[in-house]
Curated annotation (Swiss-Prot):
The keyword Oxidoreductase does not apply. This is Uncharacterized protein y4lL. It comes from the Bacteria. InterPro entries: Biofilm_reg_signaling (IPR052155), EAL_dom (IPR001633), EAL_sf (IPR035919), GGDEF_dom (IPR000160), Nucleotide_cyclase (IPR029787), PAC (IPR001610), PAS (IPR000014), PAS-assoc_C (IPR000700). The keyword S-adenosyl-L-methionine does not apply. Residues 212-264, 338-390 form the PAC domain. Signal peptide: none annotated.
Length: 827
């Protein structure tokens, strides 16, 4: 591309051009023929060319044709419609680095002499490091700068009585000639609803001599009204009398509309950071502050005089003041950009975190002129970050520790084992001891859950006091503990440790005046690190523990290979299940859910059943687990879904069908398509299908599973969270994903209405459902007193043997028909 001379390029006075060039965001102005009229230094750096090589050229001179075509189409749209265009895209900058830029293009009218032309103003914002909250803040900065630096203003003067003496030619934008605004004629262009307030403010300034700063609407030549801001100050004689008023009228319509749109958006979607304040400051060459924007003054409560010089430092939080002064004035001395986060004292009390960014500005001859900068309020982002870090820490701990005893869980054990594996020799022998508290359930039933919990804590304390610091103690389930010892020398040593643990635990307990005896059984497995993985060790120790349970309290069993017989039996079940699924030997039963206000059946939950030819009915908990282990859960789940949809089509249109989804089904990226195909093939309306998930779906590969859930919900399917309340994160997922229904786990219903704790939890869930507009369902209702309680608490639906157990499809249909006939008879 050859350098050319272009007479139509934009020129500015040196100070204004220096300020534009000091702005770190690229600014580009094109004429109606899409030629570059102006590029600031940042834009030249982005393109990687000198300004003199760009002025007068078009995108086609510096970009590939396809990319230039895209920009040309965008520019044509901006010029023809006048609508602002914003696009975010990756840009390769000189040096090969790729940055993400948000480019905003708008149309402006450029007047030079008696002629005017449309120009395209493009401003780019780098949002690479701060794409979240800071992106909104930076966008606000660019918009504010475009208003203050590029939009024309209308100057005016008035005599001490307030009569307008002269006004700039751009007053014609109101549809009135400038001469018509003289005297008090400006009022003709003003919106009637704003005129009274403006006249009062003007009269107040005339009476006191205080500056005028007022916003109002003026007529637009093309029709309607636009928002403007007028500011004015006085020139006084030596005796203090006012000689003349000097003011400007600034078009703030776009900014006003933007702020109003942002407020509305924030109220509607409760977004944050889109309308955060932007504070602008300018310094002279000596570092003394010459100007602070109105937003700075409003935030800090300072006046312009108080903020001048080094006075702005008085608004900095005392704990940050010395560091801020040192960093900023060092940057001034070195003429280097500055960026720092610190706290400002708020005018109304408290403090606000800001990120302050300053850039040196230079004259065309290289003379240092001072700094221009912005301060952005990032209080919400800082607070959210602190809360997020704290929540992450808590979640990390909760995910790896038992809430009751504070002991690590299986996940912690696995991570700790991996860490140890990097520091011990392959030949090092390890021992895993699985301990089961024999008779704990009887103690829990006899003395109550509180005593049982207290007993578990006492057992934990004894084990902690006995074990070595290098041992790892975990609680895997209600009454099962695991001990990992590294560096065991022999099987005899492992058995001795097991006996010592039994002796420690079986010593008598005194719990709140109650004497309690407890027995323990131990299953252990020992191997070198290179022989078995941790999961294999735990698995073999579990096998030994199951054998130990048959021997009663005090029994110790060490794993032997012959104990794998049970595993082989389980493998046979896997083969049998695969055969049953292929031959269609499985069945789907349907358990009713009833509306608690009308008593009407609204839903049937589809439940898989396996009538085994030899074993009889196989427990769903058993064969579902086998299906998940073998990968059969995918085809099994799809079969259940299709069977349920096929049957539900036959029911009345007000009756839905609920199907449970296994977390493993979400590993199939086509799950949403499977649901859609089942609905289309069977003809079932999507609103009559309810899919129930447990929160483990959201714990594993949360982002991917959430996306799948969103795709399913977009089909119109109802999504319910099952077993609500059994995990620590249930509440957080109500905020993460808009569930349609909550199903309260049966464990909270069993003790109703006697258990105050269960009643409090049930009441809280009902309140959450009402607040969020979510349907609330209770599982496991088997007694009338339970039903009366949940009705009183305001639940919507209930399920349980009080309403009916799982039924074959024909009986479910018969039940619906009988209900329908009863209802018809009652009418």
């Amino acid at each position: 591309m050859q350098r050319t001379s272009f007479e139509n390029q934009l020129t500015f006075d040196a100070d204004f051009e220096a300020i534009l060039n000091a702005i770190p965001q690229p600014i580009i102005v094109k004429d109606e023929h899409f030629r570059f009229l102006f590029l600031n230094d940042a834009a030249c750096m982005l393109v990687g060319r000198a300004r003199c090589d760009l002025i007068g050229h078009t995108d086609y001179d510096i970009l590939p044709t396809a990319e230039a075509d895209r920009y040309r189409d965008m520019d044509i749209g901006v010029l023809s419609t006048g609508e602002e265009v914003s696009v975010e895209e990756p840009i390769a900058v000189p040096g090969g680095e790729v940055r993400r830029l948000v480019t905003r293009k708008s149309r402006a009218i450029l007047t030079r002499g008696s002629s005017s032309e449309k120009v395209i103003v493009a401003i780019a914002l780098d949002v690479t490091e701060c794409r979240t909250a800071e992106a909104a803040l930076q966008a606000s900065v660019e918009h504010h700068r475009s208003l203050t630096e590029l939009h024309p203003q209308v100057p005016w003067t008035a005599d001490p009585s307030g009569e307008v003496l002269e006004i700039g030619p751009r007053w014609e934008k109101t549809g009135y000639a400038p001469k018509e605004a003289l005297g008090a004629g400006w009022a003709k262009a003003m919106h009637p609803d704003d005129l009274g307030e403006v006249q009062r403010e003007w009269a107040k300034s005339l009476a006191t001599g205080e500056p005028l700063d007022v916003e109002f609407r003026l007529a637009a030549a093309e029709g309607g009204y636009s928002w403007y801001r007028s500011r004015a100050a006085t020139r006084r004689a030596e005796d203090g009398s006012i000689l003349r008023w000097y003011g400007t009228v600034e078009d703030i319509d776009d900014r006003r509309k933007m702020f109003e749109a942002l407020k509305e958006s924030e109220a509607r979607f409760r977004a944050i950071a889109d309308d955060a304040p932007v504070m602008i400051w300018v310094t002279g060459e000596n570092g003394a502050d010459d100007y602070h924007s109105r937003l700075w003054l409003e935030t800090t409560g300072q006046t312009a005089e108080q903020a001048a010089g080094k006075g702005w430092l008085n608004a900095v939080h005392p704990d940050d003041r010395n560091a801020v002064e040192r960093v900023f004035y060092q940057a001034f001395d070195l003429r280097e950009p500055v960026r720092m986060e610190y706290r400002l004292k708020r005018a109304g009390g408290g403090s606000a975190w800001v990120i302050d960014i300053g850039q040196p500005r230079f004259a065309s001859d290289g003379t240092f002129l001072g700094f221009v900068g912005i301060a952005l309020d990032i209080t919400e982002r800082r607070n959210a970050e602190q809360e997020r870090l704290l929540a992450q820490k808590q979640i990390h701990h909760m995910a790896r520790h038992d809430a009751l005893t504070g002991l690590p869980n299986r996940q912690f054990l696995r991570e700790e084992f991996e860490r140890l594996s990097d520091h011990i020799a392959p030949s090092t022998r390890l021992a895993i001891l699985c301990l089961d508290l024999d008779g704990f359930k009887a103690i829990n039933d006899a003395y109550g859950r509180a005593t049982g919990d207290l007993l578990l804590r006492h057992v934990t304390e004894r084990l902690r006091n006995f074990l070595k610091q290098s041992d790892i103690l975990c609680r895997l389930s209600g009454d099962e503990f695991v001990v990992l010892r590294v560096g065991i020398n022999s099987n005899a040593e492992a058995r001795l440790l097991a006996q010592q643990l039994i002796d420690v635990i079986e010593a008598p307990y005194e719990l709140a005046g109650t004497h309690v005896d407890l027995q323990v059984v131990v299953g252990l497995a020992a191997a070198s690190k290179s022989d078995q993985s941790l999961d294999e060790l735990i698995k073999t120790a579990d096998i030994a523990l199951e054998r130990a349970k048959t021997g009663g309290g005090g029994t110790i069993v060490q794993y032997e290979p012959k104990m794998d017989a049970d595993l082989r039996a389980r493998q046979r079940m896997k083969v049998s299940l695969r055969h049953a699924l292929a031959k269609g030997e499985l069945e789907v039963r349907y358990q009713p859910l009833a509306n608690l206000r009308t008593g009407q059946i609204t839903t049937f939950e589809a439940l898989a059943r396996w009538p085994h030819p030899e074993r009889g009915q196989v427990s769903p908990a058993e064969f579902i687990a086998v299906a998940e282990e073998t990968g059969l859960i995918g085809p099994l789940g799809e079969w259940i879904l299709r069977q349920a949809c096929t049957e539900a089509v036959k029911w009345p249109p007000y009756v839905s069908v609920a199907v449970n989804l296994s977390p493993l089904q979400f590993r199939n990226q086509r799950l949403a398509s499977t649901v859609r195909n089942s609905l289309e093939d069977t003809g079932l309306d999507a609103s009559r299908l309810q899919l129930e998930i447990t929160e483990s779906v959201l714990l594993e590969e949360c982002d991917s599973n959430l996306q799948t859930l969103k795709e399913i919900r977009q089909l119109g399917v109802i999504v319910a969270i099952d077993d609500f309340g059994t995990g620590y994160s249930s509440l957080s997922y109500l905020r993460t994903f808009p569930f349609d229904k909550i199903k309260v786990d049966r464990s909270f219903i069993a003790d109703l209405p006697k258990s105050k704790e269960s009643l409090a939890i049930v009441r809280a869930v009902a309140a959450i459902g009402r607040s969020l507009g979510i349907i609330t369902t209770v599982e496991g209702v088997e007694r009338q007193d339970q039903l009366d309680t949940i009705k009183a608490e305001g639940f919507d639906e209930a399920q349980g043997y009080l309403f009916g157990g799982p039924l074959p499809a024909s009986q479910a249909m018969a039940l619906l028909k009988s209900r329908s006939e009863i209802s018809a008879a009652e009418r």
